[in-house]
């Protein structure tokens, strides 16, 4: 038993943050509906908000973190982490564990993703009154030179500089994710298809975990029910685009490259 390969019981689900998006939150809760699954929700992204161990953008060594999950989750048939890491950070996992540790990257329509990215920051990232460390970090890494020709802003104009930075993520950070050898899955497809959800689970767990119809009924009943602390929101790409002001339209056209737009179009998104 000492030689048993525990690595293949671990998996990663990546994204460029989930920012309080209900459907992104729904996915790990859905996975955890099976008692043989143990799934973290952005664990290593949230820790720096509360513990002075590292900066918000830093993460533990991912190979060591994989072994840690394998150790503490031995009582589960499968265990994984959602959203602590980005797809472009998984190369060490691929080299160390190969196909034993499986991984998928979850993408979202850019307009909707951007809405939650900005909202998360304008609402102080779920921190209490007076707790500004996370948003202070966000401000400290804004690349102001990139936005000098756009609508001006101050530190207090979080809705402006967060919008610009979110566009930079769409054009740069997410494009790095697309270059990594990983399955990219649209979140919209998972929430609209039980088959695609179960296919993803089968892939991640090497066919070790499945869900009964009653479990799936419960899982999909949560899609439009806010979790603790959430607001009831229904955000559509069309609604978002129509709500933009001129400065937002200008910023989108100047910051998001055509190459980036084409990549999202390739995955079935419309602008």
Show which residues each predicted segment covers:
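PAPS-dependent sulfotransferase catalytic domain
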Residues: 67-68, 124-199, 254, 260
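PAPS-dependent sulfotransferase catalytic core
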Residues: 1-74, 134
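Conserved phosphate-donor/acceptor-positioning beta-strand/loop module used by diverse small-molecule
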Residues: 97-119
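Glycine-rich phosphate-binding loop used to anchor ATP phosphates in small-molecule kinases
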Residues: 70-92
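Hydrophobic/aromatic beta-strand patches that form the interior of the parallel beta-sheet core
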Residues: 11, 38, 102-105, 183-185
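PAPS/PAP-binding and catalytic site of the sulfotransferase fold
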Residues: 20-34, 98, 182-210
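PAPS-dependent sulfotransferases, especially Golgi type II membrane carbohydrate sulfotransferases
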Residues: 1-9, 174-176, 203-271
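Short catalytic/ligand-binding loop motif for oxyanion handling, primarily in non-cytosolic enzymes
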Residues: 21-25, 46-50, 87-90, 111-116, ...
């Amino acid at each position: 038993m000492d030689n048993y390969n525990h690595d293949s019981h671990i998996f990663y689900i990546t994204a460029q943050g989930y920012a309080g998006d209900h459907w992104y939150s729904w996915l790990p809760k859905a996975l955890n509906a099976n008692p043989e699954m143990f799934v973290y929700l952005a664990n290593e992204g949230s820790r720096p908000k509360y513990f002075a161990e590292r900066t918000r953008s830093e993460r533990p060594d991912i190979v060591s973190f994989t072994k840690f999950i394998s150790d503490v989750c031995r009582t589960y048939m499968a265990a994984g982490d959602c959203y602590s890491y980005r797809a472009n950070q998984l190369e060490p996992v691929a080299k160390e564990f190969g196909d034993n540790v499986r991984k998928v990257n979850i993408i979202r329509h850019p307009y909707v993703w951007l809405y939650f990215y900005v909202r998360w920051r304008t609402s102080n990232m779920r921190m209490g009154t007076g707790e500004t460390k996370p948003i202070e970090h966000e401000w400290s890494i804004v690349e102001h030179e990139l936005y000098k020709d756009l609508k001006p802003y101050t530190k207090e104009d979080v809705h402006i500089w967060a919008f610009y930075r979110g566009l930079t993520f769409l054009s740069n950070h997410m494009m790095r994710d697309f270059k990594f050898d990983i399955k990219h899955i649209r979140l919209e497809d998972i929430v609209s298809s039980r088959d695609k959800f179960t296919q993803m689970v089968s892939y991640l767990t090497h066919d070790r975990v499945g869900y009964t119809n009653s479990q799936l009924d419960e899982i999909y009943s949560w899609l439009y029910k806010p979790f603790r602390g959430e607001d009831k929101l229904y955000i559509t790409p069309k609604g978002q685009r129509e709500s933009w002001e001129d400065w937002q339209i200008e910023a989108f056209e100047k910051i998001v490259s055509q190459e980036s737009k084409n990549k999202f179009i390739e995955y079935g998104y419309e602008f």
